[in-house]
Amino acid sequence: MMYNVFVAKQSIEIGYSNVGYIRKGSISVIQVKEMLVMARFTLPRDLYFGENALETLKTIKGNKAVLCLGGGSMKRFGFVDKVVEYLKEAGIETKLIEGIEPDPSVETVMKGAKVMQEFEPDLIIAMGGGSPIDAAKAMWVFYEHPETTFDDIKDPFTIPPLRNKATFIAIPSTSGTATEVTAFSVITDYSTGIKYPLADFEITPDVAIVDPSLAETMPQTLTAHTGMDALTHAIEAYVAGLHSPFSDPLAIHAIEMIFDNLKASYEGDMQARGNMHIAQCLAGMAFSNALLGIVHSLAHKTGAVFDTGHIHHGCDNAIYILYVIQ
């Protein structure tokens, strides 16, 4: 029933608006359907998946790349060295932007954009969990349009055209956010407690590399949290106001794969871990086009409120989803 109650107010901001308050400029599902007489379904141009998919970087065309990273696990497990070496084989110079925090901040984004403006890359590569990829998407916007502010792009579909300076490659290491295939990025202003839910097909990555070997490094707790994030994406996409014959099969198959593999993945089964990496990507394709619902509204608001004691977004979803369904 709650989904029916909230349909008229479901935000194009994929449920990231404050509960009970739809920010000026957000668009209801009914308005979107009126606008989208001819609907749109958008995915990355290329998606490479499976064992050794990371080696695709050897064939990438470009001159300079920035590699955006999180807390250090990708370097610790040797993936950063691999990426730098593959890019070197392709004749590409690489600069690292490291230390992107969970739920990335406005300050982190602006610092990264400044690095890009000085280095002038024609490739932006983000590797890690959802946070470094989300942050890199926002950096991309401010790299290509330095005059832009967050206020300029906070409303849906207000990001100016990209790809004049760089193309974007996303390489996920966790199996939950699926930001490697979505049109969304969430950036937090901790001074105000505001989360900026950037939503525009412009920030859909050009290339996604879904290599299961990166997900094998996840600890158990992160496996559980990201798995519940993926399950919530799939369920909400399936009942979303903008679901379609294109998004439904992706959502359904993702739900089935997650039910079949999440527990085994949590227990250390690497085949199941690889299946979860694919399932979360399918869920991302679904929700990027169908949008989400009230579970994510609640989860993102919680994340902004409790910034001093970080609650993983997937854990928030796990807490709320049963109550919302009931």
Locations of the language-model features?
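Methionine residue identity
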Residues: M1-M2
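Short hydrophobic alpha-helical segments enriched in small aliphatic residues
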Residues: V5-V7, V19
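ATP/NTP phosphate-donor binding region
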Residues: I27-L123
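Glycine/threonine-rich beta-strand-loop-alpha-helix active-site module
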Residues: E107-S213
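Glycine-rich phosphate-binding loop
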Residues: L123-D134, L292, S297-F306
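Carboxylate- and glycine-rich phosphate/diphosphate-binding segment that chelates Mg2+/Mn2+
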Residues: F184-A290
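Gly/Pro-rich interdomain helix-loop hinge
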Residues: A304-Q326
